[in-house]
Amino acid sequence: SFGLLMLTLLAFSFFSCSDKVDESNIYVFNGKSIADYIKEDPDLSYYYFMLQHAKSGKKGSTMDHLLEARGNYTVFVPTNNAVQHYLDSIFSTPNYDINQTPDSVAQDIVFNSIIDSEHNEAYKTTSFQEGTIDYKTMADRFATVTFGTNDTTGKVRIFIDAFSEITSADNEAENGWMHVVNRVVMPYSSTLPDLIAGQDNLLIFSHLLFTTNWKDSLQAIRDE
């Protein structure tokens, strides 16, 4: 009948339209996201803790959810030792309890470690050039790349913001590239005491700076 024919045509039209659904924004991966790789690696668990306590600014969501989503992210992930070293330095406390980390510090660590290339490719190390990376970090700063050479092996060494050496490069995920670093990434504009705190051979000096007023004096000199 005419009515049955119309129902058939409407049904066909509905399913035809359903086939045209844009899947570009559906958060489904065939492989793993950057967040998955970080979560599964015990040596990156401190950074994952930071992700869970850093707000993405989207309705209170945290950064671990951002790195589960589609995108083109370059992430410089510090090891547990790197995170512990940084916390010990800025709080002048050996073996600082990571659970006591203020959310603001977690956000600072995380935002300085992530570059969102939006619709462009995330960065492999083969695309790095000496100098400033084109896209800003989520902390709204330009990270820098410098190259060095291992004196023993002759292998190229890559440093982010001068002090954070990439120790495991080009770990590919569905939503970008992950590079493991041996220091928390902090920009050049960090205070001089904070930069000193990042160096193993200056730990005693760093402790003295943070336990005396010399830290403030150095900051005042830098600000002038």
Each predicted region: which residue ranges?
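Sec-dependent bacterial lipoprotein signal peptides
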Residues: 1-17
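Mature, structured domains of secreted/extracytosolic soluble proteins
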Residues: 15-224
